[in-house]
């Protein structure tokens, strides 16, 4: 039988999933995106060359790997074409390596218009979305009015459905948000111009994955964002609009849940967050600046500066529970080089003085939480690019061991730099 490995983020996204997926796909036949949209930003560095992917799975650069966009992904046709064009200009035969589910909901210009109009209307209470129409597209999906990739097979019917939904959303845009209406004809023309390209890549994803499993193929499932941004389990309402957790694999791809063999949680050696929302361990002064600059903490999708803080092991433990993690990949360990001391949050103190070791479910419950820290010695030696576990400074090894102890999960992979080669694989998920 084949092995199905899930790679997902355990924090608020930006943990370094793209690099890890790219590394592990050396042994995979398929790489599958199962949720999110082009709000993701997965950065790959291979032999010094940087590639940023937002929608196409990170396995696309591998010659013998087929990349799949599953039904749980909301797909923006213009964003997909932009990525395809950029990759093809570099000699990557995208159309030979990429497949789509016909059940992918389409993100169209009215979704983007609604996203931005709503954020503007929220003012100081804005969620901090990427403004790419992700949430409104998922809303249309759940309301059963959304258009999907499969609708493009019948262009005449697509045009009729599109007209109805444009009128529906324009009423809200113009009358409630006082924003400009979306031009139906332009939307139709733009989508139909690339419809045949999209439909040519359509496949029955669930059937493909089932047969791949029976054949013994290795499959990698690539998560986007992070566990703490999950629509159900994250810091609601400061969350994304999809299930970023392991449960999203089955619903977002059609793979039977019992076929998942290993779940790899990507955990950054410290914490970051983009946009608004709770962040108990956030740092604002010298150490926060160190993490931000040395870690190059600027969003691959939006360019926004990420908020930075100490590792929150309480939040990561929540990710362990929800995802039934098999192991961790620890990323950006090298960013901690040079710090005299390093802290790990192992609990919270409530405003009434009570100590707790779990995260609240809603954002309101995080208000007034005081992190309870353990302080460990830092290290002055460089860990950048180290590929031998035994060559790491003892203080770094102690830090790694403590993360394993407080989370109850082994660290199977350690990343010490952005390049594919700057990685230590202590236990390969496909062999676990």
From Swiss-Prot:
It catalyses: IMP + L-aspartate + GTP = N(6)-(1,2-dicarboxyethyl)-AMP + GDP + phosphate + 2 H(+). The keyword Magnesium applies. GTP binds at residues 13-19, 41-43, 306, 332-334, 415-417. The active site is at 14 (proton acceptor), 42 (proton donor). GO terms for cellular component: cytoplasm. GO terms for molecular function: adenylosuccinate synthase activity; GTP binding; magnesium ion binding. Pathway: Purine metabolism; AMP biosynthesis via de novo pathway; AMP from IMP: step 1/2. Transmembrane segments: none annotated. It is found in: Cytoplasm. PROSITE patterns: ADENYLOSUCCIN_SYN_1, ADENYLOSUCCIN_SYN_2. It holds the Pfam family Adenylsucc_synt. GO terms for biological process: 'de novo' AMP biosynthetic process; IMP metabolic process. Its cofactor is Mg(2+). It comes from the Bacteria. Substrate binds at residues 300-306. Binds 1 Mg(2+) ion per subunit. The keyword Nucleotide-binding applies. HAMAP family: Adenylosucc_synth. Homodimer. NCBIfam families: PRK01117.1, purA. This is Adenylosuccinate synthetase. The gene is purA.
């Amino acid at each position: 039988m084949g092995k199905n490995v899930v790679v997902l983020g355990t924090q608020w996204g930006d943990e370094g999933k793209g690099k890890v997926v790219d590394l592990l796909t050396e042994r995979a036949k398929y790489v599958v995106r199962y949720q999110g949209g082009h709000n993701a930003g997965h950065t790959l560095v291979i032999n010094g060359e940087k590639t940023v992917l937002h929608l196409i799975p990170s396995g696309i650069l591998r010659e013998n790997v087929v990349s799949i966009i599953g039904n749980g992904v909301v797909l923006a046709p213009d964003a997909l074409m932009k990525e395809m064009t950029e990759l093809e200009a570099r000699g990557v035969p995208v159309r030979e390596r990429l497949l789509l589910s016909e059940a992918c909901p389409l993100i169209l210009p009215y979704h983007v218009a609604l996203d931005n109009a709503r954020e503007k209307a929220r003012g100081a209470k804005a969620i901090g979305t990427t403004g790419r129409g992700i949430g409104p597209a998922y809303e249309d999906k759940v309301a059963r009015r959304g258009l999907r990739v499969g609708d493009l097979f019948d262009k005449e019917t697509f045009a009729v459905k599109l007209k109805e939904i444009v009128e529906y959303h324009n009423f809200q845009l113009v009358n409630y948000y006082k924003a400009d209406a979306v031009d139906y004809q332009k939307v139709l023309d733009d989508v139909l111009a690339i419809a045949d390209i999209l439909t040519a890549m359509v496949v029955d994803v669930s059937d493909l994955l089932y047969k791949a499993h029976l054949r013994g193929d290795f499959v990698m499932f690539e998560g986007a964002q992070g566990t703490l941004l999950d629509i159900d389990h994250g810091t609601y309402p400061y969350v994304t609009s999809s299930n970023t957790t392991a449960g999203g694999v089955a619903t977002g791809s059609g793979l039977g849940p019992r076929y998942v063999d290993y779940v790899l949680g990507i955990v950054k050696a410290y914490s970051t967050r983009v946009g608004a929302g709770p962040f108990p361990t956030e740092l604002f002064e010298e150490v926060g600046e160190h993490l931000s600059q040395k870690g190059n903490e600027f969003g691959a999708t939006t360019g926004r500066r990420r908020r930075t803080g100490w590792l929150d092991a309480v939040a990561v433990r929540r990710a362990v529970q929800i995802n039934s993690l098999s192991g961790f990949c620890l990323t950006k360990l090298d960013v901690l080089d040079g710090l005299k001391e390093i802290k790990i949050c192992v609990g919270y103190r409530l405003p009434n003085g009570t100590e707790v070791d779990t995260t609240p479910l809603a954002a309101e419950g995080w208000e007034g939480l005081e992190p309870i820290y353990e302080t460990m010695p830092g290290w002055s030696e460089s860990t950048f690019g180290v590929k031998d576990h035994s060559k790491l400074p003892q203080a770094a090894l102690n830090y790694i061991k403590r993360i394993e102890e407080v989370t109850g999960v082994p660290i199977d992979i350690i990343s010490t730099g952005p390049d594919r080669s700057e990685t230590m694989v202590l236990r390969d998920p496909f062999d676990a």
